Amino acid sequence: MALNKPKIVILGAGYGGLMTVTRLTKYVGPNDADITLVNKHNYHYETTWMHEASAGTLHHDRCRYQIKDVINQSRVNFVQDTVKAIKIDEKKVVLANGELQYDYLVIGLGAVPETFGIKGLKEYAFPIANINTSRLLREHIELQFATYNTEAEKRPDRLTIVVGGAGFTGIEFLGELAARVPELCKEYDVDRSLVRIICVEAAPTVLPGFDPELVDYAVHYLEENGVEFKIGTAVQECTPEGVRVGKKDEEPEQIKSQTVVWAAGVRGHPIVEEAGFENMRGRVKVNPDLRAPGHDNVFILGDSSLFMNEDTERPYPPTAQIAMQQGITVAKNLGRLIKGGELEEFKPDIKGTVASLGEHNAVGVVYGRKLKGTPASFMKKVIDNRSLFMIGGLGLTLKKGKFKFF
């Protein structure tokens, strides 16, 4: 048996971190290394389902599962704690309740909302970020509807929901919200015509980078279901009363709203910046083998990493699909570092992208084919189920998966 086995520490049980730890035991034997996984919760949550939990169309418990249920507990030491700092020079991770030494480090700490310095967003807008923020947003929206008819003087701002951002998360949330609002109106005796859902997007288009035909389909569907779009319009300030928005060279508009949702981008975790890695908005431009430049014992993946697409000379978007593929590569490369062997370069295999528009509608491109409506919605559920299967097998898929296809 090897003495002084190398210590592998994996930070974060998101898509990338969990994929690394579940695959690592295939490439590293019990006598080769000690494996520790650190996560602040005892559960993993499906980040790509948070728009559903936030709107209240899917219960938050359906969006998470216990980490101990999917890891090999005889091989992996799970530490539930919060990462406070990474000391690269000392090969040490500082936790809220202690410290961990490492020989090899995997950083998969995920993302935090990017507010671009817009005044009041952090204080007054609701992000779509995790189980806690989703639960809060869902309950807040329900409270506005419940309160509306109890007040002698009716307040339209309670029934006005502003969504900042018409990218992937924003559009998926709007799709769920459009489906949820009629249910809330029925439950709380509110006339649907009194409810306003307003999407504000600074870019000149909805779903940047998506096929224009699919964008038109998504916008038309959402408008039919009561969503108003203000495109080429930036959120300038968020206040307790609502938001100030405006186009360039035009007079700003005040929108009174008790519910402002911010879905316009994320940045890498601040701990990655504070650790001293060269980064862009908290994301480290990693080497082809997913190691941090200048740090041969540190791998970075998921939202914490920036991996360039050589064809477009732009970074790949930080998706769950890529994070999981990175996790497999990191697991293989850790095995090769410990046992000897040439490290593998990460090659993303983009199978497609699908944006949901509620439970039974979606738009996307899969294997080069454009999909919309029911076929796209079917594929979205297949993709969601596949991520469960890859980490937790058939048991987890049957327990948490989505099978209401039509």
Curated annotation (Swiss-Prot):
Cofactor(s) named in the record: FAD
InterPro entries: FAD/NAD-bd_sf, FAD/NAD-binding_dom, NADH-Q_oxidoreductase
Pfam families in alphabetical order: Pyr_redox_2 (PF07992)
EC number: 1.6.-.-
Top enzyme category: oxidoreductase
Alphabetized UniProt keyword annotations: FAD, Flavoprotein, Oxidoreductase
Cofactor note: Binds 1 FAD per subunit.
GO BP: aerobic electron transport chain
GO molecular function: NAD(P)H dehydrogenase (quinone) activity
Highest taxon, organism lineage: Bacteria
Annotated family: Belongs to the NADH dehydrogenase family.
PANTHER family (UniProt xref): 64 KDA MITOCHONDRIAL NADH DEHYDROGENASE (EUROFUNG) (PTHR42913:SF3), APOPTOSIS-INDUCING FACTOR 1 (PTHR42913)
Name of the protein in question: NADH dehydrogenase-like protein YumB
Organism annotation: Bacillus subtilis (strain 168)
Classification lineage: Bacteria, Bacillati, Bacillota, Bacilli, Bacillales
